[in-house]
Amino acid sequence: MDTNKEGARHLTKCAYLFDAVLARIPEDRWDAPTCCDGWTVKDCASHAIGVMVNLRNRALGEEPVDYQDGSWAGDNPLSSCRERLDDLVEAIQGADLDMQFNSPVLGDQILGEFYGL
């Protein structure tokens, strides 16, 4: 099986699992503290949703966003996650998984392999 396709499948599975986790968070717990000093549950969700946006942007060859600005969860983190998840899945389906790009942290990467990390 093609490693790059496996990477894309892995990312898609992980994104859907993240959605399932968010779906289990009670409405009154979004402002609860987490083990990340100074971060609420909503802050952590926003960070992960922003990362999802960047993964989509990689698939489309677009510039990365500031995934740490705290805005990605919006007023309804689950709805925001689902909207971004749909965008990510759509982008992956048409992506060139063999495309090479430069990650500021990991250096030169192949998109499909990167998705499998």
Where are these regions (language model features)?
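Aromatic-glycine hotspot motif
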Residues: 1-117
